[in-house]
Amino acid sequence: MRLHFRGVVLPEGEVRDLWVRDGVLTGEPIREADTIATAGWILPGLVDAHCHVGIKHGGGHEDRAGAVAQAEVERDAGALLLRDAGSPIDTRFLDDRDDLPRIIRAGRHIARPKRYIRELGIEVDDERELPDIVAEQARRGDGWVKLVGDWIDRSIGDLAPLWSDAALQAAIDAAHREGARVTAHVFGEDALPGLLDAGIDCIEHGTGLTDDTITRMAAHGTALVPTLINIDTFPGIADGASKFPAYAAHMRDLHRRSRDTVARAHEAGVPIYTGTDAGGSIRHGRIADEIIALTEAGFSPHHALAAGSWQARGWLGHRGIEPGAPADFVVYDEDPRTNLATLSNPACVVLRGRVHLRRSPVTVHR
């Protein structure tokens, strides 16, 4: 398939011609190419760096058809690269479909008994087994492992760490020996120091970050995926936790200061990327909402786009719009740098050189 696009290519902001042959961007014009767009704004494929293909909205496991439908929704929203931050089902069969987003898997959540959502993760009775389980998930994943760093401990009625510092050190070392990076679900404050001491590569949510842990993350290049649209569910979680008033108050407080927390991390230089936490309480296809939410935390539109597109792609080892790269990009009628809401309405999605959601070609720049 030979395709031609012309438009303002981001992030450079230059009007260029893009040529696609056999799913790959080329640096030279292609004769007899099918011109798809003669104007518009062209953005490297968006990234949902924290989602869960295979978890039903509202809870439970998806079947194969449901997992396909979730991936299709992500694609149509322009999210062409997904980091699946823990799924209870094997979604490798999706890799056989060239019309679905590329997925980077982190295996299954690793937690303790009664310290995470039932039936979603692997439950470790004895934390001395954690390094071996982490190594196994590293081999099954695509270069990532997902730990549950904290969760409510009903015996104390509030968030608390799941693992000792020694167990974390051994587990993260085991993952690194397998060539995998490690990320961890963390809502509160107390689990963060041990994870950072152990060399964790990424923190999910991070609502409990303090000035000290932010400084440490920035110094070590530890990434943050704040999942702001998921954090907005915290008040509802608190409302349903009347048996645990300290936990409920804690969750409300974490939500109240969440935008400020992310803003301080951004100002300190912590690498921040977009993730929706789709699957479970958040529906798939909301990457535009998460990018917009970053502007509520002090991001400029340019930096919010970077966190949800080209910088996130580079962090995950995928290329942007350049010769020799896979043709994974999105075309918009309006400039997303001046109106991020346009991200919710792509004119054309191109994945592996195939066109999806094509509307009438844009013929003017605005």
Whereabouts are the PLM-identified features?
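Metal-associated gating/positioning segment near the N- to mid-region
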Residues: W41-D98, K114-G121, A198
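Hydrophobic faces of well-ordered beta-strands that scaffold small-molecule active sites
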Residues: G45-C51, L82-D84, I103-G107, V145-L147, ...
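Acidic/histidine-rich helix-loop elements
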Residues: V53-R64, P113-V124, R154-P161, G236, ...
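Histidine/acidic-residue-rich, glycine-tolerant segments that coordinate divalent metal ions
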Residues: G86-G194, A198, C202, L209
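Active-site core of metal-dependent hydrolases
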Residues: S155-D260, E267-A268, Y273, A278-S281, ...
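His/Asp/Glu-enriched, well-ordered alpha-helical/loop segment
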Residues: R177, H255-D335
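C-terminal cap of metal-dependent C-N hydrolases
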Residues: G308-Q311, P323-R366
